[in-house]
Structure formats: structure tokens, C-alpha cells
């Protein structure tokens, strides 16, 4: 398909880039913890992302377009194949002079349930079954950021593209740690009577690696949507989808 970035010499990609003023490189084969746990060690997952990056970065080089490459805070986790792939992407982006950002657990409405992240997953479970059955014990902590805050940050960076220092770490994060159990409790409060069932196992995708985000980006941007408000918005958006 012409929409498949894993295809070499994709004519549609070349045309779209040629017609663009600026490129946000967010495309990736990725999903939530459940998806990564099952896929990130598989050949196809690694191949999908390696090819997607090679051909897209080559097209960016050929068209010489300004761009932001969206990496992940998991690029700092050496045990993660997904993180290692993002590190390769960062090297590509650096070689071409683009901006590199690291996202921290961005959430919003999702339509592909196979790849859904924890907040969407918990809302769907609470709404449809009245039970939030977790895949971990919920003690792991995350920094959650609403997609609207993330989008505002990316736009700000694009607008200031030429003045953003390339040697700074740009971590797009909320700055607030919350456990997965806290998220479940917020969501169960939106659906009275919902039961929370933690599992016995610990998180083995990020292994609860509490590396704090670099604060530099706060000089040009601040998130404004609190977690509870953001979760309520996602719930309303999911109701509208139905």
C-alpha cells in the first residue's frame, strides 16, 4: 500500500514530503505495555521499525525538510528492544539536524484496541465489564501526558525550530508521577461500582525505571491538563465514538 512506510522508494511518501513545509515523524509500530511485552522481541516488530525509519529518514534527507523525530523515554532503557530502536532513530535524526523529543506516556482516545495503552484499556474495561483486571500489581509509576498538551508542545517546537538547541534533552512529560493503581482508582470513580483487580506480577516492560525527565523543555512549554481532567476527557471522547 502507498500508506506503508516500510516500502522502499515510496512515491506517495516522497510526494507528501515534497509538498510539506514541516514534518512530524511520529509513525512507529508500537502500542501499550501489553503490546510491547508480546511483540518487541519479535523479528517482525524490529524489522517493521527499522525499515520504517530507514526509508522515512532517507526521504527526509532527499527532500531536506525540517522535522521533529518523536522518540520515547524508553530510549533510556537499555534492556528494551523498542527503546534501542528509538535510539537508532535519534542517531538518524541527529545526523540530519532535526529536533529529537522524548515522549512520556502520552494518552488520548485510541481505536486500535490491540495496541491500546493503559488509560484507554482501563476505561473500556470499567465501562464494558465493571472490572478493571490489571496485568501488573499496579505499583509501577508513570508520568502521563494528555495528547492535547503533547500536540501544543510539538507545535511550539516547530514554530521555534531554528532556535531550539540540538544538544538539549527535550522530554515532553507531565512532571508528575502516578502509579497505575492510582489511574485505576480515578477511572473506577467515573464508573461507580467498578472493581479493581491487580495482578500478582510486577511490570517487566519498563521495570519501573524511575528516571526523571530533563526539565529543559519547561523553558518554552508547560502542560496544563491535570491527569484526572484528562482521563475524564478521554472517557467523554470514547462515549462520543460509540
Q: PLM ranges: what are they?
A:
Residues 2, 28, 72, 103-106:
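Active-site loop/turn elements of alpha/beta-hydrolase fold enzymes
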Residues 1-11:
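Rossmann-fold cofactor-recognition segment
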Residues 10-48:
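NAD(P)H-binding glycine-rich loop region in Rossmannoid oxidoreductase-like domains
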Residues 48-55, 66, 88-89, 146-149:
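Conserved cofactor-binding/catalytic machinery of classical short-chain dehydrogenase/reductase
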